[in-house]
A protein has these predicted regions:
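Flexible, glycine-/basic-rich loop-and-beta segments that form/coincide
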Residues: 303-351
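Class I S-adenosyl-L-methionine
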Residues: 7-190
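Conserved Class I SAM-dependent methyltransferase catalytic core
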Residues: 142, 156, 232-321
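Conserved proline-anchored active-site loop of SAM-dependent methyltransferases
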Residues: 139-149, 153-169, 180, 197-229, ...
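Short amphipathic alpha-helical segments
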Residues: 188-189, 226-229, 268-270
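Surface-exposed cleft-lining segments at the edges of enzyme active sites
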Residues: 129, 225-234
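A general structural signal for stabilizing positions within well-ordered secondary structure
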Residues: 186, 203-206, 290, 310
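General small-molecule cofactor/ligand-binding pocket signal
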Residues: 175, 195-197, 300
């Protein structure tokens, strides 16, 4: 995730905090540690309670979730939302690893998604970081396509949230990165190979061409200023983070990531540089660069309604990449060569 301002929000206090002080008294330190453990225990108890309700098929609302959380001493709405999503991640991972067919596992996760509470609580931080997690059914299919159900595959998620995009894999297979403090703490509880808190809008040379699979749902939004990537200038955050994430994929690796909006074409059939509202979106340069350097298998347009329970109804695209081209060549296909169908049901997405 991003740790510097973007146009969407002028200020985010989470990045301006300092330690209030250091305790040196042993008894005070022990008391603080005990309180911290108690808070963690209460958080886990709430997560387990939500998991139980999800598995029983009970549908909760924002109100019932907050009421249940208050029974465990959890009253902060942001914490309730993130812990609720952690329960969804844990349950979805269990379903993803069931001893059944891919279709059966997928349908169980679709049912889970339909029963989950709408995660529509918003804060200045979540708005600035554009924190809309991936619906579990989409996350499952992206993981299956990337092959992370193979225990020998090593993966990377640079904007991991609470870990939804990793549910097909065992946590030990993944290095995950997240800048949000609440989500970072939730990731630490899941047994990942490594959890980091870095700015994923910057290059990651330590991970260059390191992973069998890269999977990500980067935040959407405009950068404060355009960034040069090779011959193109990128001004959308999700475009930039996707390109940098792809640099960590092995030459024969696979990647799946989500971009905001749908692709539009001009009268000549070329990808339009502006959307229907005449706003510059940078799609033409981005996709030409992507197709020139990578084997792009598909770009699937998804109706925003499928995102409703994640707190938004923003149209998105799932981009599937199968390796790096040995020699850069080609450009994005023209309109008549592309399936522009917008997927609006989970059944159609599976097909």
């Amino acid at each position: 995730m991003l740790d510097k301002p973007i146009i969407l929000d002028p200020c985010n206090p989470v990045f301006n905090s300092e330690e209030a002080g250091i305790f040196t008294d042993f008894e005070v330190t022990q008391t603080i540690q005990s309180i911290g453990k108690l808070v963690i225990d209460h958080s886990l108890q709430y997560v387990q309670a939500i998991e139980k309700r999800l598995k029983e098929g009970q549908k909760d609302s924002k109100t019932t979730s907050q009421k249940l959380a208050s029974q465990f001493g959890i009253t902060n709405q942001s914490e309730v939302k993130e812990l609720t999503e952690l329960a969804i991640v844990r349950t979805a991972r269990e379903y993803a690893h069931a001893n059944s067919s891919v279709l059966e596992r997928y349908l169980s996760i679709v049912n889970l998604y339909k029963n989950q509470v709408r995660l529509n609580h918003r804060t200045s931080e979540s708005i600035m970081l554009q924190q809309y997690s991936t619906p579990a059914p989409i996350a499952f299919l992206m993981g299956i396509w990337c092959g992370i159900d193979d225990p020998n595959k090593q993966g990377f998620e640079p904007s991991a949230g609470n870990g939804l995009l990793t549910i097909v894999a065992a946590p030990r297979q993944f290095i995950v990165n997240e800048i949000s403090e609440l989500r970072y703490k939730n990731l630490l509880t899941q047994g990942f190979k490594l959890v980091t808190k870095n700015d994923a809008s910057l290059k990651m040379p330590a991970y260059e061409r390191s992973f069998d699979a890269v999977i990500s749902n980067p935040p959407f939004g405009l950068l404060p200023q355009r960034v040069n990537v090779g011959p193109i200038r990128v001004h959308k955050l999700d475009h930039l983070m996707a390109l940098y994430a792809l640099e960590t994929m092995k030459p024969a690796g696979k990647a799946a990531f989500i971009l905001g909006g749908h692709t539009h074409y001009n009268a000549q059939g070329l990808i339009a540089g502006r959307n229907r509202g005449n706003h510059a979106v940078g799609d033409r340069f981005f996709f030409n660069y992507l197709h020139h350097h990578y084997n792009v298998v598909d770009v699937i347009s998804i109706d925003g309604e499928l995102y409703a329970r994640q707190g938004t109804q923003f149209d998105v695209r799932v981009v599937l990449v199968d390796g790096v081209k040995k020699e850069p060549s080609g450009f994005a296909p023209i309109a008549e060569e592309v399936n522009q169908t917008v997927v609006d049901t989970f059944e159609a997405l599976y097909e």
